[in-house]
């Protein structure tokens, strides 16, 4: 009980409310923890207090702690572990604490999904599920849904006399496809799974359309819309009252007052009818008649006031007209007929959803996979059973968990959904007044409705629970913020006291909800919050909405860049808690928050132009990367070569290398048919001389393509991808381009994606391509991952959602003028958890469609929920700031917008009028009207206080409100006078003016000469091959004989050559075999071929290289005397790399620099054998000799010896230096002809 709670220790760091949250017991407890209130610390302390309670200690594994993320769960475990270790220092003999530390790793501290998984693993036998199940990949899940749905619809299309189904198709599909119908089925399936009993929720949808024997007054849609009618009529009345006040001013249009009074009477009649019934309002709306305004002489009155009065009256009339057109242009019974007509169609739709759910679950079961919603529903299935009245009650397993858990603690409770709430309910005690559920969160930060989070669960308990906890649960408000300065908190409070209310916003921002100062900061300069509204003039706006958005982003980015640079350059100071002192601001202290990330690239670009380091996790652009795009087209062509666009892209790419002219030539060979058919036909004929090169390129690619297509049918996808990389050489090619490592990494990621795909239930190239398409359709492109340390000095750009839980000294909230995303309200059909299904009434026979009552109600409800969610998102954004908050938005016409924002300036209550808050289309529509009621806006408005209440006008907050001209931001920066002189001198090619005292220094620098000029014309590092060539050139050995020995040099990448291997590639292949051949095995044809195949599998050789190796020549070497010495040697080393210093004059015969200069020489020795009498080095050569010289090998021998003498001498010198043993013999072995040359000094 309350009186038995431990008292707060003297000098405790905890506030009274925090201490209450730590020790309160005996009932369900809801902690409303405002931003920065230390909720995690409170949660950890509560757990520790329970564990080490002297009277009734609880083992940590008897607590269930549910967190929102895995990272939060791990952090919680770490904090509890650290706290227990501190206790152990004070009580080293405590066996209980030691036991808790050992239990901590298996304690139930996890996300709700991890807990569900734990329950399912323990009780899988109660479900029809394979205990070896795996969690499905999201894209795999989508593909399975598509497959199941295609099968169902195909069956439905095949049923004769399937009248209702075809009526459903006629109403909700287009002439081209049934995509809309598929979307409806999938959306209904997804929404139903957010409820504990999906089938029951679906049945209620259908029941709502069964209006037999009902009147319009019985419909939930009509009841809700009547509330909206009252709301809009009240808005109209406010306009007329405001107009009347203006007309009564000394220079107001007094003759208008009589008409305005009649208007109020008319609106009063309508409002009275709205309080009675739908039918009453309908009848009243048919009799609406507005009086005609009396003519007045405008010069007798203040013209501006007359305009305002007439404008306000027109707004009121528009509100009524809108109601007449949307709701009351049809008789009530007409709306009922819509429901009755749509009932059988909706019934069929729900039946399809149920069939889909059943088959989808069966397919997942067959494949041994579950998704995250399955985890929740399977867990709920284990924890519940059906009672006699059809309701769900705890199962025997649930009762076991109730007995096990002393307390269940839920973090971020505001983000819980209905299914998760049911799971928690079944493992906790039934009675709230004697419960063991501890919930902590902040409903003002519930921003995950798109993930089906339900803030209403938190709000319901917050309204139901009391601070004393008498007769039910207890609520505790943690309102003290230990993060931010007074200016940030007061500024946030000032805005939200005016915009967030229960009617519009779902939450009363009352005294309990307000942020209260808990942090102490030293006095700071320029800490006032700011609103910077950028005026974008008509002339600046680029044609098109997209262009205008880009320009807005550029304007805001430039303003932020200027402010950041100015603050850093001026040494703006922020408080450092670690040193307990002020320090100059750094780039890492800034964050730019955006509602979404489309503007991020423009903002990054502007900041970089100003020299400001910046980072944003864009997570886009991977599939747009050139190298990935080209490879995806290759795979599309392998899957189906009849696709013209992918094939043309591959032919034009560096892989095949056709130019525009060659592509046109190919197309000209067959104007009909696909590119592939034309290419096949072209290759069958004999090419013209001028088309031979084109023919060779296409033949090379065509042969590869046929091989890939065959390989794709028999082998794994990942093997195919690596085969394509290898055989085209494209992986190596992109490595040589700018950002080559990144490009290769992108290709490796594609390979990894394929391996991940193959770990799913799908196989094959076609499915993989569809898999990637679904990723792109969902917008799940990937970006380059980058891990940032907390101390990395960059300005961060992130979404407001990503920033939740974080804090920054200086926060920019940008894009406040961007319109809210209302696309979900524009869909052909709407779904709502309470109101079910709503769509237009569509009559395909009469070819008409119109809005239904259900659609209007759901649309209005969703709009109000969207408004509430956007308020909470704004709250999260503003509460990230520790010391400085800067709000930025751009408007097309600031004057026009200001007139709108000033409409409610003199409103007498804290909360702005409902229609102002509900009618907002962007964040500025809330922020600006709020700030224009504060004294700090006077610098901009110069309007005086007027009738604004003192408590609002003089509220204790500091703001800077400014309108910034966009022209000044887009204008080029002025050039300094002295820089201008330099530019003019350069333009006119005159001598550049210099300050006299710097002339000598400039001259000396320009005339300076490097002391080691000779060394600059020679490399500081040389390979042995380069030194050999240098000597050959100096000695004039580049004669006809040597030319005969040299292979033609090809500089183009292999995939751009006609076909076959170069001489160099053949030589590399032979050297690779000589390096890896197993000398312990017999050297036979069969053994060598087996080893070469193994090298291909290990990617030491390509298939093409392996085919070119003459195995018999390798055997000939080992049959020779030299080869036998290798096999018999004490030790054999192959491909021995070395590096050594060599005198420059030894490397360069033309050296004329300082003596004693050295260069670095590196090389690789093919083979070194150690025999009883010393070391022999062997260099393998693949030069073509036979048939090149009239005198045969004897004629070539001296030339070859001269050519390679320097090379072998350097090899020998390197070996002797490193091994400290002389080299007794240096041998050249030529595979062509099986010749050996012993090179003498």
From Swiss-Prot:
Would you tell me the Gene Ontology cellular component terms? Answer: cytosol; DNA helicase complex
List the GO molecular function terms.
Answer: 3'-5' DNA helicase activity; 3'-5' exonuclease activity; ATP binding; ATP hydrolysis activity; double-stranded DNA binding
What InterPro entries does the database record attribute to this sequence? Answer: AddA, DNA_helicase_UvrD-like_C, DNA_helicase_UvrD/REP, P-loop_NTPase, PDDEXK-like_dom_sf, PDDEXK_AddAB-type, Restrct_endonuc-II-like, UvrD-like_ATP-bd
Under the heading SUPFAM superfamilies, the entry gives: P-loop containing nucleoside triphosphate hydrolases (SSF52540), Restriction endonuclease-like (SSF52980)
A Pfam match: UvrD-helicase
Q: List the disulfide bonds.
A: none
Q: Does the keyword Acyltransferase apply?
A: no
Boundaries of every UvrD-like helicase C-terminal domain copy: 505-805
PROSITE patterns reported in the protein's UniProt record = UVRD_HELICASE_ATP_BIND, UVRD_HELICASE_CTER
Q: Catalytic activity, per the record?
A: Couples ATP hydrolysis with the unwinding of duplex DNA by translocating in the 3'-5' direction; ATP + H2O = ADP + phosphate + H(+)
All copies of the UvrD-like helicase ATP-binding domain together span 12-485
- BP GO terms, sorted: double-strand break repair via homologous recombination
Q: Which residues form a coiled coil?
A: none
Q: What is its EC number?
A: 3.1.-.-, 5.6.2.4
Which residues are involved in binding ATP? 33-40
Q: Which key words are in the record?
A: ATP-binding, DNA damage, DNA repair, DNA-binding, Exonuclease, Helicase, Hydrolase, Isomerase, Nuclease, Nucleotide-binding
Cofactors (names): Mg(2+)
Q: What family classification does the UniProt entry report for this protein?
A: Belongs to the helicase family. AddA subfamily.
Q: Which NCBIfam families match?
A: addA_Gpos
Kindly give the HAMAP family that the UniProt entry links to this protein.
AddA
Q: What does this protein do?
A: The heterodimer acts as both an ATP-dependent DNA helicase and an ATP-dependent, dual-direction single-stranded exonuclease. Recognizes the chi site generating a DNA molecule suitable for the initiation of homologous recombination. The AddA nuclease domain is required for chi fragment generation; this subunit has the helicase and 3' -> 5' nuclease activities.
| Assembly with partners or alone | Heterodimer of AddA and AddB/RexB.
Protein known as: ATP-dependent helicase/nuclease subunit A
């Amino acid at each position: 009980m309350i009186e038995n709670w431990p008292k707060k220790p003297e000098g405790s760091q905890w506030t009274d409310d925090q201490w209450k949250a730590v020790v309160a017991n005996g009932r369900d407890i809801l902690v409303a923890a405002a931003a920065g209130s230390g909720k995690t610390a409170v949660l950890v302390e509560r757990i520790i207090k329970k564990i080490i309670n002297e009277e009734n200690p609880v083992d940590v594994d008897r607590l269930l702690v549910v967190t929102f993320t895995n990272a939060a769960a791990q952090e919680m475990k770490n904090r509890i572990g650290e706290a227990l270790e501190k206790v152990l220092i004070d009580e080293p003999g405590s066996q209980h604490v030691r036991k808790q530390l050992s239990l901590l790793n298996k304690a139930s501290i996890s996300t709700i999904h991890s807990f569900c998984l734990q329950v399912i693993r323990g009780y899988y036998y109660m479900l029809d599920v394979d205990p070896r199940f795996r969690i499905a990949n999201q894209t795999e899940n989508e593909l399975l849904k598509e497959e199941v749905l295609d099968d169902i619809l195909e069956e439905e299309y095949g049923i004769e006399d399937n009248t209702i189904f075809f009526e459903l198709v006629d109403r909700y599909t287009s002439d081209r496809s049934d995509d809309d119908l598929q979307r409806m089925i999938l959306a209904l399936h997804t929404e139903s799974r957010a409820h504990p009993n999906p089938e029951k929720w679906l049945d209620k949808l259908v029941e709502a359309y069964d209006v037999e024997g009902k009147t319009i007054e019985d419909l939930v849609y009509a009841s809700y819309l009547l509330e909206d009618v009252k709301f809009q009529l009240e808005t109209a009345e406010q306009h007329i009252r405001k107009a009347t006040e203006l007309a009564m001013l000394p220079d107001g249009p007094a003759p208008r007052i009589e008409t305005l009074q009649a208007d109020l009477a008319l609106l009063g009649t309508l409002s009275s009818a709205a309080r009675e019934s739908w039918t009453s309002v309908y009848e009243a709306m048919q009799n609406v008649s507005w009086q005609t305004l009396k003519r007045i002489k405008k010069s007798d009155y203040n013209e501006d006031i007359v305009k305002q009065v007439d404008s306000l009256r027109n707004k009121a009339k528009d509100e009524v007209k809108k109601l007449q057109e949307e709701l009351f242009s049809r008789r009530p019974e007409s709306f009922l007929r819509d429901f009755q007509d749509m009932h059988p169609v909706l019934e069929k739709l729900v039946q399809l959803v149920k069939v889909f759910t059943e088959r989808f679950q069966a397919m997942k079961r067959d494949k041994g996979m579950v998704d995250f919603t399955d985890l929740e529903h399977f867990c709920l299935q284990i924890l519940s059973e059906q009672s006699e009245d059809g309701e769900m009650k705890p199962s025997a397993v649930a009762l076991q968990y109730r007995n096990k858990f002393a307390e269940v603690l839920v973090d971020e409770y505001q983000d819980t959904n209905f299914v998760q709430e049911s799971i928690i309910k079944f493992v906790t005690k039934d009675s709230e007044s004697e419960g063991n559920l501890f919930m902590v969160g902040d409903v003002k930060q519930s921003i995950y409705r798109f993930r089906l989070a339900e803030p209403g669960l938190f709000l319901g308990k917050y309204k139901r629970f009391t601070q004393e906890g008498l007769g039910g649960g207890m609520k505790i408000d943690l309102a003290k913020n230990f993060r931010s300065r007074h200016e940030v908190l007061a500024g946030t409070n000032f805005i939200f006291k005016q915009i967030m209310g229960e009617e519009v916003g779902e939450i009363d921002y009352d005294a309990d909800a307000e942020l209260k100062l808990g942090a102490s900061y030293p006095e700071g300069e320029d800490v006032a919050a700011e609103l910077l509204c950028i005026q974008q003039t008509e002339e600046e706006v680029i044609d098109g909405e997209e262009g205008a958005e880009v320009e807005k982003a550029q304007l805001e980015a430039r303003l932020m860049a200027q402010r950041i640079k100015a603050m850093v350059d001026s040494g703006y100071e922020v408080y450092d808690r670690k040193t307990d002192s002020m320090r100059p601001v750094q780039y890492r202290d800034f964050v730019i928050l955006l509602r979404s990330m489309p503007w991020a690239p423009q903002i990054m670009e502007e900041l970089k132009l100003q020299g400001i380091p910046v980072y944003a996790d864009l997570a886009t652009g991977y599939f747009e990367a050139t190298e990935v795009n080209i490879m995806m087209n290759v795979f599309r062509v392998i899957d189906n070569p009849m696709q013209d666009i992918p094939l043309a892209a591959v032919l034009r790419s560096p892989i095949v290398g056709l130019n525009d002219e060659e592509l046109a030539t190919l197309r000209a060979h067959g104007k009909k048919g696909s590119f592939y058919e034309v290419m096949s036909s072209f290759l069958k004929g004999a090419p013209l001389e001028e088309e031979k090169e084109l023919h060779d390129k296409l033949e090379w690619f065509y042969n590869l393509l046929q091989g890939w297509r065959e390989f794709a049918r028999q082998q794994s996808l990942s093997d195919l991808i690596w085969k394509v990389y290898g055989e085209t050489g494209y992986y190596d090619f992109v490595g040589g381009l700018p950002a080559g490592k990144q490009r290769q990494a992108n290709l490796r990621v594609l390979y990894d994606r394929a391996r991940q795909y193959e770990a799913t239930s799908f196989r094959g190239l076609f499915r993989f391509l569809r898999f990637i398409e679904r990723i792109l359709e969902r917008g799940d492109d990937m970006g380059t991952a980058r891990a940032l340390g907390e101390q990395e000095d960059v300005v961060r750009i992130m979404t407001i959602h990503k920033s939740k839980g974080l804090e920054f000294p200086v926060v920019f909230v940008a894009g406040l003028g961007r319109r809210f995303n209302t696309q979900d309200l524009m869909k052909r059909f709407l779904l709502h958890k309470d109101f079910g299904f709503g769509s237009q009434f569509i009559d395909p026979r009469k070819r008409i469609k119109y809005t239904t009552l259900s659609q209007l109600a759901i649309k209005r409800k969703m709009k109000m929920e969207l408004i509430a969610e956007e308020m909470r998102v704004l709250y999260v954004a503003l509460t990230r700031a520790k010391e400085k908050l800067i709000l930025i938005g751009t408007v097309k016409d600031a004057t026009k917008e200001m007139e709108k924002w000033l409409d409610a300036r003199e409103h007498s209550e804290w909360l702005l009028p409902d229609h102002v808050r509900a009618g907002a289309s962007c964040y500025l529509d809330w922020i600006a009207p709020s700030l224009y009621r504060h004294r700090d806006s006077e610098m901009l408005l110069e309007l005086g206080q007027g009738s604004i209440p003192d408590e609002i006008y003089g509220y204790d907050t500091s703001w800077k409100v400014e309108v910034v001209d966009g022209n000044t931001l887009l204008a080029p920066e002025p050039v300094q006078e002295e820089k201008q002189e330099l530019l003019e001198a350069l333009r006119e090619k005159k001598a550049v003016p210099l300050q006299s005292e710097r002339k000598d220094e400039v001259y000396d620098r320009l005339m300076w000469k490097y002391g080691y000029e000779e060394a600059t014309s020679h490399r500081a590092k040389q390979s042995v091959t380069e030194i050999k060539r240098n000597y050959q050139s100096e000695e004039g050995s580049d004669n006809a004989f040597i030319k005969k020995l040299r292979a033609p040099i090809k500089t183009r990448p292999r995939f751009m050559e006609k076909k076959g291997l170069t001489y160099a590639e053949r030589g590399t292949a032979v050297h690779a075999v000589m390096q890896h051949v197993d000398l312990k095995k017999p050297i036979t044809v069969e053994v060598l071929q087996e080893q070469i195949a193994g090298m291909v599998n290990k990617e030491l050789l390509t298939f093409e290289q392996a085919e070119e190796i003459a195995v018999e020549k390798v055997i000939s070497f080992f049959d020779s005397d030299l080869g036998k010495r290798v096999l018999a040697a004490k030790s054999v080393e192959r491909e021995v790399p070395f590096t050594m210093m060599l005198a420059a004059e030894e490397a360069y015969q033309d050296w004329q620099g300082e003596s004693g200069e050295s260069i670095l020489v590196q090389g690789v020795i093919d083979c070194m054998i150690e025999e009883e009498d010393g070391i022999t080095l062997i260099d393998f050569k693949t030069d073509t000799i036979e048939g090149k010289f009239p005198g045969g090998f004897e004629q070539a021998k001296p030339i070859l010896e001269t050519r390679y003498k320097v090379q072998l001498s350097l090899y020998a010198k390197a070996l002797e230096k490193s091994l400290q043993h002389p080299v007794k013999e240096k041998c050249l072995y030529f595979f062509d002809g099986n010749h050996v040359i012993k090179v003498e000094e």
